[in-house]
Structure formats: C-alpha cells, structure tokens
From Swiss-Prot:
Protein source organism: Pyrococcus horikoshii (strain ATCC 700860 / DSM 12428 / JCM 9974 / NBRC 100139 / OT-3)
HAMAP family to which the protein is assigned, alphabetical: Archease_arch (MF_01222)
Family membership: Belongs to the archease family.
NCBIfam families in the cross-refs: PRK00407.1 (NF001617)
GO molecular function: calcium ion binding
Residues engaged in binding Ca(2+): 12, 141-142
Record function comment: Activates the tRNA-splicing ligase complex by facilitating the enzymatic turnover of catalytic subunit RtcB. Acts by promoting the guanylylation of RtcB, a key intermediate step in tRNA ligation. Can also alter the NTP specificity of RtcB such that ATP, dGTP or ITP is used efficiently.
PANTHER family, alphabetized: ARCHEASE, PROTEIN ARCHEASE
GO BP annotations, alphabetical order: tRNA splicing, via endonucleolytic cleavage and ligation
InterPro entries reported for this sequence: Archease (IPR002804), Archease_arc (IPR022952), Archease_dom (IPR023572), Archease_dom_sf (IPR036820)
Name of the featured protein: Protein archease
First and last residue of the signal peptide: none
One Pfam family matching this protein: Archease
Effect of residue 12 to A: Impaired ability to stimulate RtcB ligase activity
C-alpha cells in the first residue's frame, strides 16, 4: 500500500512517499510532487505518458524520474494523479519505466497551489524502513 505526505522544511515543502516496494515509494512521492502543485484528488486519468530513465544510483533515478514528469508538466501542461513504476537493474545501472496518468491542467478544477521550479537532491533519502517498507523523500525547489 502506497501513501504520501508533505513535511515541513524551513521555508520549503518536503515530499515523502511510502510503499510496500521501492516502486510504490517512487509512485507515492510523484503523487506528493503533483499535490504540491494542484489538488490531485481532482485530477482524472484521461491521458497517459510513458517515461523511461536510467541512472547509476537510486537517488539519480528518482531525480531523473521526477524531473521528466516536471518537464512534461511544463511543456504539455499536464498534471498527474497516478503512476505505474517498474525498476530494474541492467548492466550495473538502474532503469525505470513508468506510466503517468492525468490530464491537462484546468485552473478552476485542479485548484493550483505552488509552482515547483525544479527537482533537487536537497534532503533526498531513499531507504528501506525497519518494517520492510520503502520511503523516498526530497525537497523540490518551489
């Protein structure tokens, strides 16, 4: 079961995702990212975008995944509410393939909040918790 939350971090907003698997934690932190920008509960799954990124480590993989989502948001004006993430290790690198589900931003419907300017490595952590679940977090540039 995945869940997400925002956490206070000085003048910024931290985003944190939890999941039974690493993939679910990545999905949850992506939902948290978009909930910083809009009310994700009002976003419908009308469109899908496929994403593929590779990186040397999990932190770079999370950064690249969220950065790609932010680029799609900026260029196409899409907001997302749900994700299907698959992560595998190939030739010593991590590969992430994902589907992102959402729709075009509607200012009246989606209740815009903050603008996320960039993904950062600030306070980024990806770890397996003592209960066996996974957690991923970071503080984006608002």
């Amino acid at each position: 079961m995945k869940k997400w939350e925002h956490y206070e971090h000085t003048a910024d907003i931290g985003i944190r995702g939890y999941g039974d698997s690493l993939e679910e934690a990545f999905e949850a932190v992506a939902i948290a990212l978009f909930d910083v920008m809009v009310n994700v509960n009002k976003v419908e799954k009308k469109e899908v975008r496929e994403i593929e990124v590779e990186a040397e480590d999990l932190e770079a993989l999370l950064y690249s995944f969220l950065e790609e989502l932010l680029v799609i948001h900026d260029i196409e004006g899409l907001v997302f509410r749900d994700f299907e993430v698959k992560i595998e290790r190939v030739n010593g690198k991590y590969r992430l393939r994902a589907k992102a589900y959402g729709e075009k931003l509607d200012l009246k419907k989606h209740e815009p909040k903050e603008e996320v300017k960039a993904i950062t490595y600030h306070d980024m952590k990806i770890e397996r918790l003592p209960n066996g679940k996974w957690m991923a977090q970071l503080v984006p540039d608002i």
